[in-house]
């Protein structure tokens, strides 16, 4: 099996359009070139240099070449060819240039969006043969699963104490990333779209960039009058650059390529090009490096190979030195700042990537670049230029789904707010708007969202790559440590009401708001969804015990505790009295209730430990070791089809739609759009011995992950364990600093807006840190997996009751005895809640239990849960004593 070609990532490399392939040995050279393979399968992929996901995707496309039979390839080729409309494609515009081989590109260029219709077979896992020192049972353990399968297994089984996570933890080439590559490597023959985003670019970004580069152009023009060597060359470069940056749509960037010899069949460009010009390559062949862009720019770009920037001589003279200074002082900072601004706007991703690519090439090989309008095409056969970049639109709404290293771009953009907030919060001087309490409070609250997401991603990544015991421990510790630290800081500042409201608000959000919104969101795609009633029953049992343990001290104190009557006259012979429970200087609370709260806290932690023990010792073998081939096929079918697959032993549970490959389940075959070019099949040499492609729909044996770890695909994580650990610790440290700033300015905000600290805890402090959980729950529901959505809310409510409340009691106990029994109750978490809080939580648990008992969700039930949450919040608003 051929291996991916080494991509030259040196300074002389350019922005690539597609990934080439190279055979390891002459005898392993494929019979047909990768150009033809990509052409036939419609894999119109345009990765950037160093983009691992893109390299993985193209590597998989070549693996698919070996899976499909010649008959299937021929059928798909005819199918795609029949869809090409000569009246709308660019082929009719270039038929007058037959040497350009445009007709061969019809299936790659005009059918880019149709590449998802590729038929794909489903395979079954064959029994693993035991290796030396290993039993068949050990081979079926968790080490034999890819990371994708392990994540799906964790989500499907919903093991107690494990982190449920919707975004892919493995390397996955997403359709939005492929579209982003296409948008900056579009067909120069197509006319640009006249859109409002292009006008916004012209006014907001193009004009300022034009003025900055115009200064450099004037300077080099003046130098050219004094006959400074190469000044006129740099002047032309700046002139083309400033007009391109003013309005890049309808123009393209060219790059000169050094002429290469094609006499050697071992040359990478020769290997990927020769079969498309002549059946028998000869020395009369034209130089592939000099062919115009229409022959290879959209499939095999020579920039992907070792692009030589010495085509244009680069002499060290006064002009080059001046240009270098201008580049680092003026051009590069301007382009990079503008690129960052475009990236922060989320929707201007094509412009941001274009500016980044131009900035790189202006540093390495500026004189090899040229900027031309699209009317200058096609290129002549003797031209050594190739098309590097071609952008048709400045922005698109779809880029809110764009990912960087597996993280959505919106979370990366929000990271830019963290460091300034910490700096202004600790070192900023008063008197400025950016050091005001309102600004720092708002900025700190927003900064919590990306930090919580990164912590959740790191915890899920470590859990999926480690044993279940380690994953459960990491989730239990870091899943609650950030909230516990925030609450501890608030208690130290004397905001016990804020902590009390945050705890109640988190429970209500997990029991009502999160499942309610998930049901309403899931009804958008499917009116009814079903889940396993037995699994939901176990969760309901845990919730009932958690509520009993958390609110038992409150019930006993309300029944047996003393109270105080505060009366005021209402007339001549009447008084209006209000009953208040006071904990200070109360002997019943000190001698009876307080020890009882410590016992309840121990019981809550013990219940969590028993649940983990049951999961690790009982469910672990069921989840990992006893997974049969049918279970794995069921997981794949659920994940690839994106719909629940009927199976007697699996209940009504279905997994998320991570991908969209068509599968074969039983005797019925379902074809769906293909979202993702990655697959579980790998091409490592160590796997070839255990892989068998047979027409009996059997999946080749997958090797042990720890023995043959792929560098891409389902086996390769987005974050390694060491990287996840570093991110986890760093995000936790930053979260602690943000929590200090947030609590420091709470009192000022409360005084300015006249709201109670408990209501602030019920709303902002309870909802904002849980934004990641809401995102995961709604994403699962949209992918027709409402069971996981409801499990996320219940699991978080259990974590609050079973872990966070005992931790707060432990912190209060430490503060109570350290202060010598003289500390105020404003600095303690008493575990004695108001009566309305207790009644609300209990009713909500019974309401959710009733919804669980039916095993069916729809927008009606979701709306009822959301309305119940709103009623509870209104009660806290109008009767918050």
UniProtKB/Swiss-Prot annotation:
**Gene Ontology biological process:** calcium ion transmembrane transport; intracellular calcium ion homeostasis
Ranges for region Disordered: 1-39, 52-142, 641-717
State the compartments where it is located. Answer: Endoplasmic reticulum membrane
- Check the record and name the Pfam families matching this protein: Na_Ca_ex, YccF
Bias class Polar residues marks the residues at: 1-19, 83-95, 646-657
What residues form the membrane-spanning segments?
200-220, 329-349, 407-427, 438-458, 471-491, 504-524, 537-557, 594-614, 726-746, 762-782, 794-814, 828-848, 859-879
* Keyword Membrane attributed: yes
Membrane topology term reads: Multi-pass membrane protein
Does Phosphoprotein count among this protein's keywords? yes
- Compositional bias annotation for Low complexity: 99-113, 678-688
Q: Name one GO cellular component term.
A: endomembrane system
GO molecular function, one example? calcium:proton antiporter activity
Provide this UniProt record's keywords sorted from A to Z: Endoplasmic reticulum, Ion transport, Membrane, Phosphoprotein, Transmembrane, Transmembrane helix, Transport
Instruction: Name the residue ranges with Basic and acidic residues bias.
Output: 63-77
- Family per similarity comment: Belongs to the Ca(2+):cation antiporter (CaCA) (TC 2.A.19) family.
Q: What does this protein do?
A: Putative cation exchanger.
Query: PANTHER family, from UniProt?
Result: VACUOLAR CALCIUM ION TRANSPORTER, VNX1 PROTEIN
What protein does this entry describe? Putative cation exchanger C521.04c
